[in-house]
Regions:
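Ligand-binding loop in jelly-roll beta-barrel domains
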Residues: 67-91
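Transition segment at domain starts
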Residues: 1, 7-11
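Short, conserved beta-strand element in jelly-roll/cupin
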Residues: 32-48
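Conserved short histidine dyad/triad with adjacent acidic residue
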Residues: 3, 16-33, 67
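Short acidic-glycine-tyrosine-enriched beta hairpin
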Residues: 51-67
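Short histidine-centered beta-strand/loop micro-motifs
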Residues: 9, 27-33, 50, 74-75
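A generic "binding-loop/recognition-motif" signal
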Residues: 24, 34, 53, 69-70, ...
């Protein structure tokens, strides 16, 4: 799925779409959100740790984080740019 398709899919599923980025080396310790999130990396990389399992996402990769899911974020050495979707938790 490319960036245009990803954005269209987010909108179809009721996500608010925005573009963002984080600085190189930034670490965000364990936390959770009150919303469902989907993210596609469009520059750099980010590692998410969930349930003690780390997974690194590179350009073109995408992931979903459900509302209430505890996770940590570690940004790669060149930062990360992304397109993201956010929507109120379903249910």
């Amino acid at each position: 799925m490319n960036q245009i398709e990803f954005e269209a899919d987010l909108r179809r599923q009721g996500y608010q779409v925005f573009y963002g980025g984080l600085q190189a080396g930034m670490v965000n310790p364990d936390h959770a959100h009150d919303w469902d999130a989907r993210v596609m990396v469009i520059g750099g990389e980010i590692t998410l740790t969930r349930a003690a399992k780390a997974e690194t996402f590179h350009v073109g990769d995408n992931c979903a984080v459900a509302a209430g899911e505890v996770h940590a974020e570690r940004v790669g050495p060149q930062g990360v740019a992304y397109i993201a979707g956010r929507r109120n938790a379903v249910g």
